[in-house]
A protein has these predicted regions:
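Extended recognition/assembly regions associated with phosphoester-bond processing machinery
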Residues: 1-217
Length: 217
């Protein structure tokens, strides 16, 4: 598990990241909420760095890679070229999400990669939205897990990985993607036992016990 929010399966040379939500900033700007319009560039910069560091043979984008159906019309040509460069020389798979059911098909120009609902990697099943109930071998996104972690007289809120050893939920990779508390209703009944939390720090992923995670204020 990487501090960028991606997961790396070394044996399969596969890099997985969920919920990039490219062009979320420009979507908010159209609604009058002015945010710095650089979220797509920052998200792709981190993906480029992960790809350069690990040299994956395959990158799996685990759904909601684009923030909305109109995102392809707003993406800067330079950012589209960065995405092309990331895909060059490797397999790129777009798992479709609820925000981007068409995958890369709506992006300008020829975009590399295939589109699928799920992908099987050895004993793992990769999909965007986790199925209800306990699932063995599932790797999913969609829920944007975050944890409010107690320690040293204060709490800090961090994006996080969350797993019970049977299934893994990835944090949102996108710069503006936000998150939901893993103590909230969206995660209820999802794990067979109290899960282990991997809170994302600036340089590494920190293992956090379930007992150290607080509910939202």
């Amino acid at each position: 598990l990487l501090p960028s929010g991606a997961a790396w399966i070394a044996a399969a040379r596969t890099l997985i990241c969920a919920d990039l939500h490219l062009e979320k900033g420009s979507a908010y700007a159209q609604r009058g909420q002015l945010l710095p319009p650089y979220d797509t560039r920052e998200t792709l910069r981190r993906l480029s760095l992960d790809a350069a560091t690990h040299a994956p043979e395959r990158i799996v984008l685990l759904g909601d890679t684009l923030h909305d159906a109109a995102a392809p019309g707003r993406i800067d040509p330079d950012d589209a070229q960065t995405l092309l460069a990331i895909a060059r020389g490797r397999s790129l798979l777009w798992i479709v999400g609820n925000h981007d059911p068409d995958g890369p098909g709506a992006l300008p120009g020829p975009m590399p990669g295939d589109t699928a609902e799920t992908l099987t990697v050895d004993t793992l099943t990769l999909r965007h939205e986790p199925l209800a109930g306990e699932q063995s071998g599932e790797v999913a996104g969609h829920l944007h897990p975050c944890a409010r972690v107690a320690g040293k007289g204060r709490t800090v809120r961090r994006r996080c990985f969350v797993t019970d050893g049977r299934r893994l939920i990835l944090p949102a990779y996108g710069a503006y993607a936000g998150g939901l508390s893993i103590r909230g209703a969206a995660f209820a009944g999802m794990f067979a036992r109290p899960p282990l939390v991997g809170a994302i720090g600036s340089r590494r992923v920190h293992a956090v016990s379930w007992g150290s995670v607080r509910g939202e204020l």
